[in-house]
Amino acid sequence: MSALNLTVRVHPVVLFQVVDAFERRNAESHRVIGTLLGSVEKGVVEVTNCFCVPHKEHDDQVEAELSYALDMYDLNRKVNSNEAVVGWWATGNDVTNHSSVIHEYYARECNNPVHLTVDTSLQGGRMGLRSYVCIQLGVPGGKTGCMFTPIPVELTSYEPETFGLKLLQKTVGVAPANRPKTVPPMLDLAQISEASTKLQSLLDLILKYVDDVIAHKVTPDNAVGRQLLDLIHSVPHMSHEQFTQMFNANVRNLLMVITLSQLIKTQLQLNEKLTFLPTA
């Protein structure tokens, strides 16, 4: 498959690690680089992890601690053997003169490595994200070169990552600037109530869209129609009594788990007080 047909999907944890590495950089470092880890399947490069590689850039050369990069990769392989080197990342919104030199190293580590740039300067009020592949140029028997060509990049996340991002969004504006922003964990029933309320609002939005299409107030979108059809087909067919019975059973199980967890918490607190109780 041609490198130009690749699509890059980046998980949020990668961006957090890039920003953390940029904040911890040396004072004389203007740019931070690192290795991208993930998998490649059917033309999709899914980036799930990364780490920073210490380096120094001079006018005519680049010095990178390659032994450190190999050690970090071996450690990551012990934790998750499914993650392989898929490319490299750098802070900034441009491809520099040293990028081709760094890319040559990663071209020896994997096929068609991707180059991801993250604009940590937040130009335009947001973090710019771009991905590139390096295409060889030249004529037979003549000079050759390379050119970084942009390819599509998008953000993706697993369900736990999505939940974590939503929790992080709740910390915005919950406390003054001089105090740490914290959000206490929600109880299980409160989470169910919040999810049900959000689901109800989304259903109302879908119903409004369908009514507007039927009334010819909105131009129908075939892609949205196919997604709604797939959504309807994914709903299991059951009677109202069956749904009520299944829902009540799940609620009973949830209440039982909450009760047992509270009992365990109380027992641990009691055991802690008995442990530190002074003996006669």
Swiss-Prot record:
Keywords: Cytoplasm, Initiation factor, Protein biosynthesis. SMART domains: JAB_MPN (SM00232). Its main location: cytoplasm. The keyword Chaperone does not apply. GO terms for cellular component: eukaryotic 43S preinitiation complex; eukaryotic 48S preinitiation complex; eukaryotic translation initiation factor 3 complex, eIF3m. GO terms for biological process: antibacterial innate immune response; defense response to Gram-negative bacterium; formation of cytoplasmic translation initiation complex; positive regulation of Notch signaling pathway; positive regulation of peptidoglycan recognition protein signaling pathway. One of its GO terms (molecular function) is translation initiation factor binding. Pfam families: JAB, MitMem_reg. It is found in: Cytoplasm. Residues 8-138 form the MPN domain. CDD domains: MPN_eIF3f. InterPro entries: eIF3f, EIF3F/CSN6-like_C, JAMM/MPN+_dom, MPN. It comes from the Eukaryota. Belongs to the eIF-3 subunit F family. Component of the eukaryotic translation initiation factor 3 (eIF-3) complex, which is involved in protein synthesis of a specialized repertoire of mRNAs and, together with other initiation factors, stimulates binding of mRNA and methionyl-tRNAi to the 40S ribosome. The eIF-3 complex specifically targets and initiates translation of a subset of mRNAs involved in cell proliferation. This is Eukaryotic translation initiation factor 3 subunit F-1. It comes from Drosophila persimilis.
